[in-house]
Amino acid sequence: MRKSIVSPSNAAATPIGELWRDLERIARVEISSEDESFPIEHALSRTVTGGWKAATTGPQLIRLHFDEPLAVKRLQLHFVDKTSERSQEFAVFAGAGAELKEIVRQQWSFSPQGSTEEIEEYTVNLSGITTLELKIDPDRSHDPKQSQSYASLQSLKLA
């Protein structure tokens, strides 16, 4: 056993807000649709808020292609729906090139009378990824072709 006695550091820890990556600068994004009032930049920005919303109903895709291979230790997804009663499912995939592996899959039920916000934060160990993909099915209670719900994303953050 190697042991050292050290004095506590007076330096403050770096706030997590400063650790989130600047996705607008390091990635190119592909989306399946976009409401012009809620562009994807609003969900990926570290400064702008307002989130992204799909222009069409049913399942949607957000795919990030990174300029350089990336290591990711934390992933945060934030969804908000204050008006609809619905069950949503999302899945995150990541990898290099066409080889993507599922990282997480999660379902959530929104209700205007209570459950209006979902924030999921995951500790991951991804290295050398060039692509991150988010698939959102905004309404698990219907056949995707019959869904009347619009997918939305308040924010996506990586550290």
PLM feature segments, named:
Residues 101-125:
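Extracellular carbohydrate recognition and processing domains
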Residues 79-88, 142:
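Extended, low-complexity, turn-rich repeat/linker tracts enriched in Gly/Pro/Ser/Thr and Asp/Glu
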